[in-house]
């Protein structure tokens, strides 16, 4: 399926599903994308694919009607991070992220860089604690807080800086919705339908559980991209979410 769209006229989806594209080969990625419908999900492009294929690959996905989460986790001095976020907005992506551990000045600069884009600005999300990290990993970094407590501290800083939300584990979602309110968006990786392997994610949850926990956007990768019928898999996930709503 190929749809023609621009940043202002993409296919609209109400689905909270964001499919993580993790391909080494551009043609394989596009072959997968052409099997699914932009009404059923958004797409996430991360560091590897963006480094391999660049902004033009994002444009090709947008031309097929998909909203794009550009998952590059910017973490730099404030001026550099701000310019990077503005470049993502120029590309017309739907969502872009930074590391909350970059600090308040960096996050504020990133937010201010999006002001000129007005209603066309992408959602600006901060990464708290990577879902692969456990308490022992934080101890190695000199942190005595649990992953949940550290993530909440970073989320509070993110909200104070005026960003749209955070990337967090599904286990933190219930608490975060209570503390930060319904408008503060929660984006959660490590979401896997029942029966899927955990892979390299440590803190995982099913789509239905994530929805109940208050997750706004759930990132799902291999259970969809490696499915023999990804379009049907997406429809089944969305149907289960509608039943759970």
Swiss-Prot record:
UniProt-listed Enzyme Commission number(s): 4.1.1.23
Catalysis performed (reactions): orotidine 5'-phosphate + H(+) = UMP + CO2
Binding site for substrate: 22, 44, 71-80, 131, 192, 201, 221-222
Gene3D superfamilies (alphabetical): Aldolase class I
The organism's place on the tree of life at top rank: Bacteria
TM segment ranges: none
GO MF annotation: an example: orotidine-5'-phosphate decarboxylase activity
Residue numbers annotated as active site: 73
Oligomer status and interactors: Homodimer.
Family: Belongs to the OMP decarboxylase family. Type 1 subfamily.
Protein's name in the database: Orotidine 5'-phosphate decarboxylase
Species classification: Bacteria, Pseudomonadati, Pseudomonadota, Gammaproteobacteria, Enterobacterales
């Amino acid at each position: 399926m190929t749809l023609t769209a621009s940043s202002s006229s993409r296919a609209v989806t109400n689905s909270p599903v964001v499919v993580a594209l993790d391909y080494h080969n551009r043609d394989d990625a596009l072959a997968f994308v052409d099997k699914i419908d932009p009404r059923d999900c958004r797409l996430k492009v991360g560091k590897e694919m963006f480094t391999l294929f660049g902004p033009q690959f994002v444009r090709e996905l947008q031309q097929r009607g998909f909203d794009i989460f550009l998952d590059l986790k910017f973490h730099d001095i404030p001026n550099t991070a701000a310019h990077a976020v503005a470049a993502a907005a120029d590309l017309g992506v739907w969502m872009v992220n930074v590391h909350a551990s970059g600090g308040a000045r960096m996050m504020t600069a990133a937010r201010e860089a999006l002001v000129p884009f007005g209603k066309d600005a992408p959602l600006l999300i901060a990464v708290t604690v990577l879902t692969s990290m456990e308490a022992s990993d934080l101890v190695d970094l000199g942190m005595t807080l649990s992953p949940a407590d550290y993530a909440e501290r970073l989320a509070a800083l993110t909200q104070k800086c005026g960003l749209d939300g955070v990337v967090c584990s599904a286990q933190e979602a219930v608490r975060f919705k209570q503390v930060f309110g319904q408008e503060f968006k929660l984006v959660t990786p490590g979401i896997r339908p029942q029966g899927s392997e955990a892979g390299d994610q440590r803190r995982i949850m099913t789509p239905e559980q994530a929805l109940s926990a208050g997750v706004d956007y759930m990132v799902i990768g291999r259970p969809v991209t490696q499915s023999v019928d990804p379009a049907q898999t997406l429809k089944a996930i969305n149907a289960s979410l509608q039943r759970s709503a």
